[in-house]
């Protein structure tokens, strides 16, 4: 599923193309796309119609549109395959179009989702740590690209856990936006195995992992994110190309760019982890999972 850079690419596109526009009408074309909005399709369409899109915001992987004059946000769940496309209305309807919003700017905002894990929902905005976020996102920590991300405080929280460092990196209540791809890339850059226990790592080593996560996600963002298939696209339907720059993730049996040792794939939390067995020494005894 998309991680921080991919979601930020979408957010920037929405900010560029639809912020300032008002919603003239909304067509709900598949019930699963609004299943998180419990009052139903008519309520969602009714509340959105006439609203002005005042902003496009994000925290970690969570994306939402700020609406005026209401005090609610449109939370967009991209799921595994969700796309937010800004299209001229005369373009043919996409095969997996789930929601279409007609804007007064003359454009369509289209939510396309092949696997139907994503969707739209309205949520009230609440203040958390000096920022307004949807109440459904209130428990999510700041991400490494947030201007108010506190590296030292996050290092302290991470070190206070008794868990594998990769597991903690994936915990969105500790630090948000990092998924499997960028966790593996950050750990490779910091030369730390994902099974290392956080309370056995020094503060500087944990800081190195988080700094590496910042760096790799900034680089991915500059390349439009990581696209492994046609489902990961920006608002214009274009794919990113950071997958060409990955050092560890998905590189099983290929030489480590640093030392030449074959990258190894291991099972972790019902997914795959990729690491260099030489640069990232595994602990003698892997913690029970």
Swiss-Prot record:
Binding residues for DNA: 96, 115, 161
Keywords noted in UniProt: DNA damage, DNA repair, DNA-binding, Glycosidase, Hydrolase, Lyase, Metal-binding, Multifunctional enzyme, Zinc, Zinc-finger
Record keyword Lipid biosynthesis present: no
Cofactors: Zn(2+)
Zinc finger (FPG-type) residue numbers: 247-281
Job of this protein: Involved in base excision repair of DNA damaged by oxidation or by mutagenic agents. Acts as a DNA glycosylase that recognizes and removes damaged bases. Has a preference for oxidized purines, such as 7,8-dihydro-8-oxoguanine (8-oxoG). Has AP (apurinic/apyrimidinic) lyase activity and introduces nicks in the DNA strand. Cleaves the DNA backbone by beta-delta elimination to generate a single-strand break at the site of the removed base with both 3'- and 5'-phosphates.
Family per record: Belongs to the FPG family.
The name this protein goes by in its record: Formamidopyrimidine-DNA glycosylase
Species, as recorded: Rhodococcus opacus (strain B4)
Taxonomic placement: Bacteria, Bacillati, Actinomycetota, Actinomycetes, Mycobacteriales
């Amino acid at each position: 599923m998309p991680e921080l850079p991919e979601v930020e690419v979408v957010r920037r596109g929405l900010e560029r193309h639809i912020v300032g526009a008002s919603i003239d009408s909304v067509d709900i074309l598949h019930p699963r796309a609004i299943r998180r909005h419990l009052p139903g399709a008519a309520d969602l369409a009714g509340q959105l119609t006439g609203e002005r899109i005042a902003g496009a915001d994000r925290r970690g992987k969570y994306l939402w549109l700020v609406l005026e004059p209401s005090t609610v946000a449109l939370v967009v769940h991209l799921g595994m395959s969700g796309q937010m496309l800004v299209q001229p209305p005369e373009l043919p309807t996409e095969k997996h179009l789930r929601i279409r919003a007609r804007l007064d700017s003359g454009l369509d905002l289209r939510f396309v989702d092949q696997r139907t894990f994503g969707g739209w929902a309205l949520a009230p905005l609440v203040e958390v740590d000096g920022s307004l976020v949807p109440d459904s996102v209130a428990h999510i920590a700041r991400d490494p690209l947030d201007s108010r991300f506190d590296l030292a405080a996050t290092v302290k929280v991470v070190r206070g856990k008794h868990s594998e460092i990769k597991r903690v990196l994936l915990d969105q209540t500790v630090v948000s936006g990092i998924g499997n791809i960028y966790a593996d890339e950050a750990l490779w850059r910091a030369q730390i195995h994902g099974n290392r226990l956080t309370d056995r790592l020094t503060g500087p080593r944990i800081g190195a992992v988080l700094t590496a996560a910042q760096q790799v996600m900034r680089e991915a963002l500059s390349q439009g994110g990581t696209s492994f298939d046609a489902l990961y696209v920006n608002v214009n339907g274009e794919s990113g190309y950071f997958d060409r720059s990955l050092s560890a993730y998905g590189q099983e049996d290929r030489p480590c760019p640093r030392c030449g040792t074959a990258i190894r794939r291991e099972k972790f939390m019902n997914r795959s982890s990729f690491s260099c067995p030489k640069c990232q020494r595994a602990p003698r005894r892997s913690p029970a999972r």
